[in-house]
């Protein structure tokens, strides 16, 4: 069975590397501009009067490789923006501005125009301003193009959502993803291009091409989620990216997240699993599996969240609930994420 590690990505090694890096950083300013206590969360923030200024930074990863193969660069800027703004809203912040960074081996005017078009689409959907950026020509350092960005967001101190109020009995509402989004592309490319010998124009079993699926842009959840925050008591928010539902552990770490009511898994994930002979556990630890964002609320607020999501034409479902502990094979586990699928119970560690 092929794994994400076989494709060159070890999420556990990445965690260790991040911890090693952070362990050497201990400086803080001594004035009133202090960081918020959000270590390990989706975004970083600093105090600014009655507000927090929130920063997120991210790129598109190896999705850019597929864009280069297909000679289609219009959607990847949307992915870059989505990866940033979807993280920012996880603490209740409203994204307001973006700066981008593009490193290139070489670039044509046509590709630049495609990227510009995608940037415009992404900032429009996120309702943010692109206020600057940097383009670096680095022919001796990189191959192809890399695109990343940093988003600024704001939230009142009194309105920050950390997930710490999530408790037993609350429910998890899952919002549909648009597809593969921007995570697991290394494994998808290995399955399609190496194991199955397909190309970007090859048709999958359900009619779409590989490029159609892999270049569908990441859904931007800014508008519906900010609307939900205004109209319901939202307790926790999670952007489901690399690591899948493990991301829920960024919220309240003292509870268990039980996901046992998933909707139909989209065909792109079934295709990857079938062609690559990928285990269920590996799929759920690598991909979003059809749920791109989670909203945690009390049971009485769940229908309101689903209603708002549907208003934005995003299907939403109650996919699970919060427990104090979960029983697995006669043993009670705490502080974990459990996914039940195909009659199997999987711990997302």
UniProtKB/Swiss-Prot annotation:
Domain of life: Archaea
Pathway annotation from the record: Purine metabolism; IMP biosynthesis via de novo pathway; 5-amino-1-(5-phospho-D-ribosyl)imidazole from N(2)-formyl-N(1)-(5-phospho-D-ribosyl)glycinamide: step 2/2
GO BP annotation list: 'de novo' IMP biosynthetic process; adenine biosynthetic process
Enzyme Commission no: 6.3.3.1
Location(s), subcellular: Cytoplasm
MF (Gene Ontology): ATP binding; phosphoribosylamine-glycine ligase activity; phosphoribosylformylglycinamidine cyclo-ligase activity
Main location: cytoplasm
Recorded catalytic activity of this chain's protein: 2-formamido-N(1)-(5-O-phospho-beta-D-ribosyl)acetamidine + ATP = 5-amino-1-(5-phospho-beta-D-ribosyl)imidazole + ADP + phosphate + H(+)
Keyword annotations: ATP-binding, Cytoplasm, Ligase, Nucleotide-binding, Purine biosynthesis
GO cellular component terms given for this protein: cytosol
Family: Belongs to the AIR synthase family.
NCBIfam families cross-referenced by the UniProt entry: purM
Protein name, UniProt field: Phosphoribosylformylglycinamidine cyclo-ligase
Originating species: Methanococcus vannielii (strain ATCC 35089 / DSM 1224 / JCM 13029 / OCM 148 / SB)
């Amino acid at each position: 069975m092929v794994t994400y590690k076989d494709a060159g990505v070890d999420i556990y090694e990445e965690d260790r590397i991040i911890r090693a890096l952070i362990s050497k950083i201990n400086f803080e300013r001594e004035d009133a501009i202090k960081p918020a206590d959000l270590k390990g969360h989706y975004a970083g923030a600093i105090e600014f009067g009655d507000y927090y200024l929130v920063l997120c930074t991210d790129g598109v990863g190896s999705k850019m490789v597929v864009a280069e193969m297909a000679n289609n660069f219009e959607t990847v800027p949307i992915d870059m923006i989505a990866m940033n703004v979807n993280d920012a809203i996880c603490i209740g912040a409203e994204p307001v501005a973006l700066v981008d960074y593009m490193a290139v081996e070489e670039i044509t005017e046509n590709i630049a125009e495609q990227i510009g078009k995608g940037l415009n689409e992404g900032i429009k959907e996120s309702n943010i301003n692109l206020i600057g950026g940097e383009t670096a020509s680095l022919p001796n350092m990189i191959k192809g193009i890399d695109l990343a960005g940093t988003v600024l967001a704001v939230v009142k101190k009194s309105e920050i959502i950390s997930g710490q109020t999530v408790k037993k009995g609350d429910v998890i509402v899952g919002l549909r993803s648009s597809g593969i989004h921007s995570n697991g592309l290394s494994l998808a490319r290995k399955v399609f291009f190496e194991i199955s010998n397909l190309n970007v124009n090859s048709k999958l079993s359900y009619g779409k091409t590989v490029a159609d699926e892999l270049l569908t842009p990441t859904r931007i959840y800014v508008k519906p989620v900010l609307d939900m925050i205004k109209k319901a008591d939202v307790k926790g928010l999670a952007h489901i990216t690399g690591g899948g539902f493990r991301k829920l552990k960024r919220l309240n770490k003292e509870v268990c997240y039980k996901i046992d009511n998933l909707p139909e898994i989209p065909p792109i994930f079934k295709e990857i699993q079938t062609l690559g002979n990928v285990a269920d556990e590996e799929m759920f630890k690598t991909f979003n599996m059809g749920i791109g964002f989670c909203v945690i609320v009390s049971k009485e607020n769940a229908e309101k969240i689903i209603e708002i999501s549907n208003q934005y034409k995003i299907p939403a479902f109650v996919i699970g609930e919060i427990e104090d502990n979960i029983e697995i094979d006669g043993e009670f586990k705490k502080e974990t994420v459990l996914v039940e699928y195909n009659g199997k119970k999987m711990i997302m560690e």
